[in-house]
Amino acid sequence: MFDNLQSIKERHLDLERLLADPDAAGDQTRFRKLNKEYSDLREIVETYDRYSHIKKQLEDSRQLLKNEQDQEMKALVEEEIEELQRQIPALEQEIKVLLLPKDEADSRNVILEIRAGTGGEEAALFTTDLFRMYQRYAEKQGWNFQMLDYNESSVPGGFREATISITGHDVFGTMKYESGVHRVQRVPDTETQGRIHTSAASVAVLPEAEEVDVEIRKEDLRLDTYRSGGKGGQNVNKVETAVRITHMPTGMVAACQEERSQLQNKERAMKMLRAKLFDIQLAEQQQARADLRRTMVATGDRSAKIRTYNYPQSRVTDHRIGFTTHALPQFMQGEIGELIDALKMHDQTERLQAAQQ
């Protein structure tokens, strides 16, 4: 696994020279591609440089120990050798993880879908809670979080479903572990006997697709317009600005009502539809791989119960990795980074074990 590190370092230097060329920015498509490759390799090269530096220090210290006569100096050198030896395994592990094949979709933006499941009005309120949790997490990450479409429930403040666009750095690579069924246990405000009710919401995280990723024929689409309930000034409920697009071969539907014009809503609905079709395409490719890993973390199985939010115990438990926190209020305020980091680490460990078999 370490054999190609030197060639990676040489490629990184080549890219640095190419990007420094004043003519490089002339072709923006090529420039962005080179810049992304440079960024992807930088962390590997920097970690490898630290590793090489420590290995050199270790070699020098061992040589010094052989020639040193002073006992106090020998003791100091032995301490230094011990400390350097402690650092090497962690760096080796870090390099192995960095060398794992990257999921090309990780750098993409996301279409996030949250839908109320079992539990009636309480499920709709929980869907809103999840919406706000992800909105606050996106703000902390510096991402752009934009509502695309929603269906309100009969209970004030509740969503039957919501569709959101999230754009920023490595959004899919961070959010992909959220796909699945989220279960909540709490006492509803309307419950007079104090009984705990269980309800659920499903989350789907779809990587945003480019036009080149998915071929969509115009004749396969049905476009319907309707009156928007969203923003739009005087147009609201007067002009049919909202758009619903149906992909006839698959039955996939995408709708948008949040923009002010029908054209803008159509563009966003097409973006949502491309993401849905691209997600099907990616799932088929993954299923076809001989090395398909069958863990829920890896597959993002949306029918799988992945997490429980227990309000009486102020507890959040992720069932895939056995992670538990008793800081539920903070978690619902978007403090979900610790869990996402743990899920990433678990995924990397599994992939590393598979690569070494």
Curated annotation (Swiss-Prot):
Origin superkingdom: Bacteria
Keyword hit for Glycoprotein: no
Cellular location(s): Cytoplasm
Post-translational modification: Methylated by PrmC. Methylation increases the termination efficiency of RF1.
Protein family per UniProt: Belongs to the prokaryotic/mitochondrial release factor family.
Known function: Peptide chain release factor 1 directs the termination of translation in response to the peptide chain termination codons UAG and UAA.
Protein name per UniProt: Peptide chain release factor 1
The organism of origin for this protein: Chlorobium phaeovibrioides (strain DSM 265 / 1930) (Prosthecochloris vibrioformis (strain DSM 265))
Gene that this polypeptide is encoded by: prfA
